Amino acid sequence: MEISRMTSCSDAEFQQIEALIGVLSTSCKANREIIGEVLSKEDSHLFIAKDIEGRIVGMTTVCCFTIPTGRHATIEDVVVLPECQGTGLGRRLVEEALDYLRSTGKAYKVGLTSKPARVAANALYRKMGFKQKETNVYTLDV
């Protein structure tokens, strides 16, 4: 498996990303324009994992931001195709994102969220050293 930071997205690659987002959530859809924005912004980075045939089988997004307390980042949308789950690919994607943040200095604190139902993912994040916070997460469509 090869993991890299995506800089452009062909139609075929967009369809593969669309399939991955379907694995992550049945209520979310991939948006070609938004993918283009993610790839063009300096504060967002899409990491993809390709198998030996060049098919995208996993991905994660890193979003960087600066607030008065410092440079922070969130890791979002860590997802691997079902047939590739349990192979360590999710860990490798998160490690690649963390290595990027460390090497660029874009963030000194990283957060992520995961649904409680994603038992294996939550166990992975704890094993990697992420600490579960006692907090509520609120969202609002604007």
Label every PLM stretch briefly.
Residues 1-30:
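Short amphipathic alpha-helix that is part of the acyltransferase structural core
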Residues 44, 70, 75, 133:
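Short coil/loop residues immediately preceding or within conserved phosphate-binding loops
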Residues 48, 55-64, 74, 79:
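Conserved beta-strand in the GNAT
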Residues 64-65, 140:
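A short acidic/small-residue loop/turn micro-motif
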Residues 80, 86-99, 123, 127:
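Conserved acetyl-CoA-binding loop-helix of GNAT-fold acetyltransferases
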Residues 91, 103, 116-134, 140:
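Conserved active-site alpha-helix within GNAT-family acetyltransferase domains
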